[in-house]
From Swiss-Prot:
Gene Ontology MF term list: DNA binding; DNA ligase (NAD+) activity; metal ion binding
Cofactor: Mg(2+); Mn(2+)
Catalytic residue positions: 113
Record-linked InterPro entries: BRCT_dom, BRCT_dom_sf, DisA/LigA_HHH, DNA_ligase, DNA_ligase_AS, DNA_ligase_CS, DNAligase_adenylation, DNAligase_N
Protein name: DNA ligase
Family of this protein: Belongs to the NAD-dependent DNA ligase family. LigA subfamily.
Biological processes annotated in GO: DNA repair; DNA replication
Binding sites annotated in the UniProt record for Zn(2+): 403, 406, 421, 426
Residue positions binding NAD(+): 32-36, 81-82, 111, 134, 168, 285, 309
Enzyme class name: ligase
Catalytic activity: NAD(+) + (deoxyribonucleotide)n-3'-hydroxyl + 5'-phospho-(deoxyribonucleotide)m = (deoxyribonucleotide)n+m + AMP + beta-nicotinamide D-nucleotide
Species the sequence originates in: Lysinibacillus sphaericus (strain C3-41)
EC number: 6.5.1.2
Matches recorded under Gene3D superfamilies: 5' to 3' exonuclease, C-terminal subdomain, 6.20.10.30, BRCT domain, DNA ligase/mRNA capping enzyme, Helix hairpin bin, Nucleic acid-binding proteins
Encoding gene (name): ligA
Length: 667
């Protein structure tokens, strides 16, 4: 190593140590001027010797090349959301269920719920290689370059391990105030709260903008099975993350009873204004992994954790108007237009009125002073009216008799609270149906946003979803803010969607009561759109998990001549009409996975956890996250922990990875 290489290595080491002390430990060991001087020296050396730039160099934090967009990434392990508690009764019920399942010998770990943006960080051999947003929990967006600008995120860990961690990126209150002051001076729109500011900063295409926003982070979990790192619980995991160099929130506490949990909540309800960052609640988790495994998961969240949300904030403001929108199924939804008001750190100008019955029951009128509540709900609610402040000339609000978009007569189906427009030619319904068709969970056509869809309809370029596949670059470049490159990308994305497996098309058709799961089940069972269209209600309800409502809705939809005509046109332009997944034909005795409940634990070498799960599910098995008496088989990789021990205790059959591969090869 020559003198320059040695100095660059020395500067990297010093700057990492100083940065860790400043941003993670909050205990600076040198003056800012000293740090800046060393950083500038390193920048100069790297500019003169670009081949000597380390991948984890502190200079990589200042922001790199502007990107064209964020690519989608699938999380190795889903980023599940938590169930919510809004009062002491909710927490008591959670505690009762936990004790009923695992007894009284356990403890909780209570942590502050940071009000920011959930992120996932991947490290290979100790080096930060990828960062992503939570997205929908399964698929997020890669924002590695922007996350590198957060000084609290280590670019190299203290051990050369491969690991994925989860955390919350946030904007400190002081950074938020400074940013909004700058935006006010520049005549720019202000951010409503630090959470929005953090999310907006991390979605900037230019990392230099993110770098200027002074974000920070707390890391609170390992993605996947923490036991493979020799950890047996959540509190120990947080200590382990700190030892690796990650910032974790120190304001946490182990509690033995729900009364201790409530005391912790009361303390931070009172003291949250004194924190340097925003919090919106407290997260409560059962500590030991073995007990977490015993409690298991619901479809959406773990049974061993809950998020207590601070009490709803209520404010009063004036109802200026009631806006009526028409959805893809024709439902007319009323929304309150309000004098802007701050609620729970957010500027609120619109609030949900749900339906005609709520407006009538609460006698909500234009000009009223109304009570707005916002808690765990994303959408604020109108919860009451101050009758004593009502204007003298007010009159009861009447829902219209006709559609606000197409003027067709509105109807109310028996048993429903909603008014509906049943005109299939209604502009709003067509627009919303096409937006749904192209959405991520359906045909997933990137670049075809709401405004583009509306422009295409108004330009008379499309009338239904089949027309999308006839669009040309020449037509698209005539649209507002649509250049040739964007038009080319959009046409390519539309054409690529033709190759989707049939279940995506079935989702995109927007058939009532038919969601993602039902669409996949029906597609797998029948194999082709033609077969589904010919199916009877009796054939459909005979399928496991397809109920009467779904079956009736499918038959009704496909008996409509207009719907069948659209599907025929889609087929004519080349949209795939068959199921592309593997249809399992189970032969008793030939397949050891079919109908079995299986748990994967430990580290697999020949397959990833997701690959193993997919293969087992293709063969009719169900993969769960916890071991119980209902488990048929546990497949244990290296460093398997409490799940393996519990399987042996319960006498459940256990395979190693070689057994799994051997059986897969026999099928």
């Amino acid at each position: 190593m020559n003198e320059i290489e040695q100095r660059i290595a020395e500067l990297n080491k010093l700057l990492h140590e100083y940065g860790y002390a400043y941003y993670v430990l909050d205990k600076p060991v040198v003056a800012d001027s000293v740090y800046d001087q060393l950083l500038h020296e390193l920048i100069a050396l790297e500019e003169a010797n670009p081949s000597l730039i380390f991948p984890d160099s502190p200079t990589q934090r200042v922001g790199g090349t502007v990107v064209e967009g964020f690519k989608k990434v699938t999380h190795d392990y889903p980023m599940l959301s938590l169930s919510n508690a809004f009062n002491e009764a909710d927490l008591q019920e959670f505690d009762r269920k936990v004790r009923q399942a695992i007894g009284d010998h356990f403890s909780y770990v209570c942590e502050l719920k940071i009000d920011g943006l959930a992120i996932s960080l991947k490290y290979e051999n100790g080096v930060f290689v990828q960062g992503a947003t939570r997205g929908d929990g399964v698929v997020g967006e890669e924002i590695t370059a922007n996350l590198k600008t957060i000084h609290a995120i280590p670019l190299r860990l203290k051990e050369p391990i491969t690991i994925e961690v989860r955390g919350e990126a946030y904007m400190p209150k002081k950074s938020f105030e400074k940013l909004n002051a700058q935006r006010a001076d520049n005549g720019e729109e202000l951010f409503a709260n630090p959470r929005n500011a953090a999310a907006g900063s991390l979605r900037q295409l230019d990392p230099k903008i993110a770098a200027s926003r002074q974000l920070s982070t707390f890391i609170y979990a390992i993605g996947g099975d923490g036991e493979i790192y020799g950890i047996d619980g959540h509190a120990e995991m947080l200590d382990y993350l700190e030892d690796l160099g990650f910032p974790s929130n120190k304001e946490r506490q182990r509690c033995s009873t729900i009364e201790e949990v409530m005391a912790f909540i009361e303390h931070w309800t009172e003291n949250r204004p004194h924190l340097a960052y925003e919090i919106d609640g407290i997260v409560i988790k059962v500590d030991r992994y073995a007990q977490q495994d015993e409690l298991g998961y619901t479809a959406k969240s773990p049974r061993w954790a809950i998020a207590y949300k601070f009490p709803a904030e209520e404010v009063v403001t004036t109802l200026l108007d009631i806006d009526l929108t028409v959805g893809r199924t024709g439902v007319v939804t009323p929304t309150a237009i309000l004098t802007p008001v701050q609620v729970a750190g957010t500027t609120v100008q619109r609030a949900s009125l749900h339906n005609e019955d709520l407006i009538r029951d609460k006698d909500i009128r234009l000009g009223d002073t109304v009570i707005i509540r916002k808690a765990g709900d994303i959408i604020p609610q109108v919860v009451g009216v101050l009758i004593e402040q009502r204007p003298e000339n007010s009159v009861p609000f009447e829902m219209p008799k006709n559609c606000p978009v197409c003027d067709s007569e509105l109807i109310r189906i028996e048993g429903e609270v909603a008014l509906r427009c049943v005109n299939p030619a209604c502009f709003a319904q067509i627009a919303e149906s096409i937006k749904y068709f192209v959405s991520r969970n359906a045909m997933n056509i990137d670049g075809l946003g709401d405004k583009v869809v509306e422009q295409l309809l108004r330009a008379d370029l499309i009338h239904d979803v089949s027309d999308l596949y006839h669009l040309t670059i020449e037509q698209l470049v005539e649209l507002e803010r649509m250049g040739e490159k964007s038009a080319t990308n959009l046409v390519n994305a539309i054409q690529a969607s033709k190759e989707n497996s049939m279940e995506r098309l079935l989702i995109g058709l927007g058939i009532r009561h038919v969601g993602e799961k039902a669409a996949k089940i029906v597609s797998e069972q029948f194999g082709s759109m033609e077969a589904v269209m010919a199916a009877t209600e009796e054939q459909l309800v005979a399928i496991y998990e397809i109920g009467d409502k779904m079956a009736s809705s499918l038959v009704e939809y496909f008996s409509n001549d207009d719907a069948r005509a659209v599907i025929e046109r889609l087929a004519e332009v080349g949209v795939n009409m068959t199921f592309k997944g593997k249809k399992v034909e189970v032969v008793v005795g030939d397949n050891p996975f079919a109908g079995k409940t299986i748990v994967l634990t430990g580290k697999l070498e020949q397959l990833t956890r997701n690959e193993a799960k997919a293969k087992i599910e293709e063969l009719g098995g169900t993969v769960t996250g916890s071991v119980s008496k209902k488990t048929d088989l546990v497949i244990a990789g290296e460093d398997a922990g409490s799940k393996l021990a519990k399987a042996e205790q319960l006498g459940i059959e256990v395979w190693n990875e070689d057994n799994l591969i051997e059986q897969l090869n026999l099928i």
